[in-house]
Design a protein with these regions (language model features):
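Long, low-hydrophobicity ectodomains and other hydrophilic envelope-associated domains
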Residues: 1-68
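Short, compact, well-ordered microdomains
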Residues: 55-100
């Protein structure tokens, strides 16, 4: 299983056809995650399709694509099917997303 990380976003290779709960719909834009601190966004460049599901976002790409962010190096990801994970900080008192 391949994984790619850009700041607080983890992109994990997934199996196609994995059953998903609830409604699956195309995302409204090319943004994976909006940054909390600066407002910059982790976004896709290329022909990849982002889908919103009850479990989070997925990416399906027939060709390599790029993930870009104003404060991180651009990463190139090969074609495939991926799950998008927003990484969280661990604290015994509370769970919160990693500040990017």
């Amino acid at each position: 299983m391949k994984m790619y990380r850009q700041g607080d976003v983890l992109i994990v290779e997934a199996k196609r056809g994995r059953p998903m709960r609830g409604q699956v719909k195309p995302a409204a834009d090319n943004v994976l995650v909006y940054g909390e601190a600066t407002g910059h966004a982790h976004r896709i460049e290329g022909d990849a399709v982002i889908m919103d599901t009850a479990e989070g976002k997925t990416i399906e790409a027939a060709r390599p694509f790029r993930v870009v962010h104003d404060e991180h190096d651009t990463i190139e990801i090969p074609e495939g099917f991926y799950r998008v994970v927003r990484q969280r900080e661990y604290d015994e008192e509370q769970i919160r997303y990693v500040a990017d």
